[in-house]
């Protein structure tokens, strides 16, 4: 594949994974220049964007590149101005990109500091009420791996600092013991490497890589749900590490009990240690994050502009810092000083229609479960008692009405049920709604509550 073909595929996948605002602001207009020596050089026309992409999106792009090209490639975003200083004799003409040798691929399986964002340390982590406990637990684990909490399970929404804490643990462990073998990976990458090891008959090398280490940091574990072989492999990896007193840190967007299609034996192991959750930052924490950012970047931004951002962007840290980056780029491109008015103008696309949060099936299960006194895990169970089966059908109905997920995907989130079960549930609830006005009001109230999540 040429660079252009590779990057088109990367952008297509990234568009599905990132918010519309993040994608259009930072990634949409980038261009893959070359892939060389395990590094992808990607061009961005705006300096702030290149810096932001390197800090916040390098990991997700690296995982996507692995999916597209089938081997490890580390993305590096540079500006078109920096391209002149890029020391290679290549031209920008698209050419065929070839897979590196096995030696090169193995060399990219680093166990050291290269895996971690240099910025993501404990010193740069802004502590507030929503993350104080996860921060303390992470520091305890980093100070004494496998002696404090093992495993440490961190969960919370997107962009709240889970990955920052995992990188901080990695940095701190290596500061204390430079010879420690530390792996940071995502469950998606773990799955891809596992599949590749089966395909290439390299299962022993895969197991050696993941089991002969001191610390395993694995992000977004929820993505192994419904992957039976991957779960089995991770189960044995977990056991091997835990029995040998090696530290395991896991992150997810939800607690273990809410991960559908997760084997009970894995779920119980995730609950062996300490489970901590990160919640969205309050106003004071948001202001502290912005102030720390402008101090680090040596920027001059009026307090009233920061106040405007902190008041308007409340969902997560990534969007908060993204808004600041967008403002800086907007000011630079227009050649105007930053004021509250310019800030409002720069962020109007984000703030005006902040868009209702995208509804997830987990949101629906949580609210329906609370209303009918059904545990979230029961939606995925095989139980058919009416007290569980009927709320499950209501949740399936609402999942089809309020989300864009396919029938098979909805069935998967309800214990791997067939798409015909979802169709039947939708038809039954639709019929009951027409016949029972009280029930109709009940479901409408549930729908309103879900939309307001």
Curated annotation (Swiss-Prot):
Gene3D superfamilies tied to this protein: 1.10.1750.10, 1.10.8.60, 3.30.300.180, P-loop containing nucleotide triphosphate hydrolases
Alphabetic keyword roster: ATP-binding, Cytoplasm, DNA replication, DNA-binding, Lipid-binding, Nucleotide-binding
Disulfide cross-links: none
Residues that bind ATP: 159, 161-163
Gene Ontology biological process terms in this record: DNA replication initiation; regulation of DNA replication
GO CC terms, sorted: cytoplasm; plasma membrane
Region (Domain III, AAA+ region): 115-331
Pfam families: Bac_DnaA, Bac_DnaA_C, DnaA_N
The organism's place on the tree of life at top rank: Bacteria
Region Domain II, residue ranges: 71-114
GO molecular function, one term: ATP binding
InterPro entries: AAA+_ATPase, Chromosome_initiator_DnaA, Chromosome_initiator_DnaA-like, Chromosome_initiator_DnaA_CS, DnaA_C, DnaA_dom, DnaA_N_dom, DnaA_N_sf
Subcellular location: Cytoplasm
Region feature (Domain IV, binds dsDNA): 332-453
Functional summary from the UniProt entry: Plays an essential role in the initiation and regulation of chromosomal replication. ATP-DnaA binds to the origin of replication (oriC) to initiate formation of the DNA replication initiation complex once per cell cycle. Binds the DnaA box (a 9 base pair repeat at the origin) and separates the double-stranded (ds)DNA. Forms a right-handed helical filament on oriC DNA; dsDNA binds to the exterior of the filament while single-stranded (ss)DNA is stabiized in the filament's interior.
UniProt family annotation: Belongs to the DnaA family.
Subunit structure of this chain's protein: Oligomerizes as a right-handed, spiral filament on DNA at oriC.
Free-text comment on this protein's domains from its UniProt entry: Domain I is involved in oligomerization and binding regulators, domain II is flexibile and of varying length in different bacteria, domain III forms the AAA+ region, while domain IV binds dsDNA.
Protein name: Chromosomal replication initiator protein DnaA
Species in which this protein is naturally found: Staphylococcus aureus (strain bovine RF122 / ET3-1)
Gene giving rise to this polypeptide: dnaA
